[in-house]
Amino acid sequence: MTHAFFSDPAEKILTELTPTERAAVESVRRSLEDDPAQGRGLPDADPRSESRVVELLPEQTGGRGISVVYRYSQDLDACLILWLIAGP
C-alpha cells in the first residue's frame, strides 16, 4: 500500500477548509493509498516521480472546487500532497 501524506503548506490550507471540503480532500488522500496514479498528469522535470492532480467539483466537496496537487514516487511508494487549491 502506498503512503499518502500532506506537505506543511497543504496541512495549513487544510485547516482553512470547511468540514465537508476537508472530508472530500481526506477521501482523496485515502484513495491515493490504493491508486496513486489516479490523477491527471502534470508536466514534471523529475524522472523519478510524477506530478499529478485530482480535481474535486463543488458537488463533491459541498463547497468550492478543490484541486489536490501531489507528487508520486514509485521508488518510495509514497504520495506527497503538495498543494490544495480551492476555487471561488
Describe the predicted segments one by one.
Residues 1-30:
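Arg/Lys-rich, positively charged N-terminal/basic patches that mediate binding to nucleic acids
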Residues 22-24, 35, 50, 71-72, ...:
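Generic alpha-helical propensity signal that fires on short helical segments
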Residues 21, 44-47, 68-69:
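Noncatalytic linker/hinge segments flanking ATPase motor cores
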Residues 1, 12-16, 56-88:
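Enriched for short, Lys/Arg-rich terminal
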